[in-house]
Curated annotation (Swiss-Prot):
Alphabetical list of InterPro entries matching this protein: Ribosomal_bL19 (IPR001857), Ribosomal_bL19_CS (IPR018257), Ribosomal_bL19_sf (IPR038657), Translation_prot_SH3-like_sf (IPR008991)
GO cellular component: cytosolic large ribosomal subunit
Name listed for the protein in its UniProt record: Large ribosomal subunit protein bL19
Gene symbol of the encoding locus: rplS
The entry's keywords: Ribonucleoprotein, Ribosomal protein
Keyword Cell membrane: no
Function, in words: This protein is located at the 30S-50S ribosomal subunit interface and may play a role in the structure and function of the aminoacyl-tRNA binding site.
Organism: Coprothermobacter proteolyticus (strain ATCC 35245 / DSM 5265 / OCM 4 / BT)
Family to which this protein belongs: Belongs to the bacterial ribosomal protein bL19 family.
Taxonomic lineage of the native organism: Bacteria, Pseudomonadati, Coprothermobacterota, Coprothermobacteria, Coprothermobacterales
């Protein structure tokens, strides 16, 4: 068991800022696509939204980010220690009273009472 922990420690990223539920974050994620000629192309896409859930610990830690795009709610799960994660920036800090903000799925516009914390 000690071997697994040591391997996980070498794979974990240290440049990931602390993120809590209720924070508004901007995630830059690298996608690799294959074009018609068969070449692999990678591009970076930014995704900004509210963190509605935080799951796991250690190397398996991930966050669920929700945003409204063209009137439709979109949620994406991002592993925090993935090599495809280019940048994670906390835009605003929020203080909420729940561990999971799944009730935002029922709201049309991300109307949530958030206190900003410093």
């Amino acid at each position: 068991m000690d071997i697994i922990r040591r391997i996980e420690q070498t794979m974990m990223r240290e440049d990931v800022p602390p993120v809590e539920v209720g924070d508004t974050v901007r995630v830059k994620w690298r996608f690799t696509e294959r074009d018609r000629s068969g070449e692999d192309k990678s591009r970076v896409q930014a995704y900004e939204g509210i963190v509605i859930a935080k799951k796991g610990t250690g190397i398996s830690e991930s966050i669920v980010v929700r945003k409204i795009s063209s009137g439709v709610g979109v949620e994406k799960t991002f592993p925090l220690h993935s090599p495809n994660l280019v940048d994670l920036e906390v835009v605003t800090r929020g203080k909420v009273r729940r561990a999971k903000l799944y009730y935002l799925r029922e709201k049309k516009h991300l109307v949530v009472k958030k206190k900003s914390r410093f």
